[in-house]
Design a protein with these regions (language model features):
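A short, Lys/Arg-enriched amphipathic alpha-helix from helix-turn-helix/homeodomain DNA-binding modules
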Residues: 1-17, 26-27, 48-68
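…primarily DNA-binding HTH/wHTH and HhH modules…
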Residues: 88-114
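Terminal helix-turn-helix DNA-binding modules in bacterial transcription factors
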Residues: 41-77, 104-114
Length: 114
């Protein structure tokens, strides 16, 4: 999506109410134009998958910078409505749980130190 850089910079997805309509408004286009620009997101459920992937990527960044954050804190900071939604979206985006992600980051950090 062409506005990925702006979305990642401004992080409108941290609002739990950020949905397809909010994304379209954020992009400053009509619904029709949005569907032409990104036809794969014509279905609101697929748009939500995209938004949740942005949230999961942001969660991974927070985890790398603040490994002491709780799952509840990260879910809240990233715009997920609850911790279960965060855990599910994270696993969907990365194929591993946030805990496994942190463990692998710690392992990589240890290897770099040796």
């Amino acid at each position: 999506m062409r506005s990925d850089a702006r979305v990642n910079k401004e992080k409108p997805f941290i609002d739990p109410d950020f949905d397809q309509d909010a994304l379209i408004k954020f992009m400053g286009v009509s619904h029709e134009t949005f569907c032409k620009l990104v036809p794969r997101y014509k279905d609101p459920a697929r748009t939500l998958d995209y938004i949740n992937s942005l949230r999961a990527e942001y969660a991974a960044k927070i985890l790398m910078e603040h490994s002491d954050c709780s799952a509840d804190d990260i879910a809240s900071k990233c715009g997920f409505r609850n911790t279960a939604a965060y855990l599910s979206a994270f696993k969907f985006a990365f194929g591993i749980t946030p805990t496994d992600f942190m463990n692998s980051m710690k392992q990589m950090f240890k290897k770099k130190q040796n």
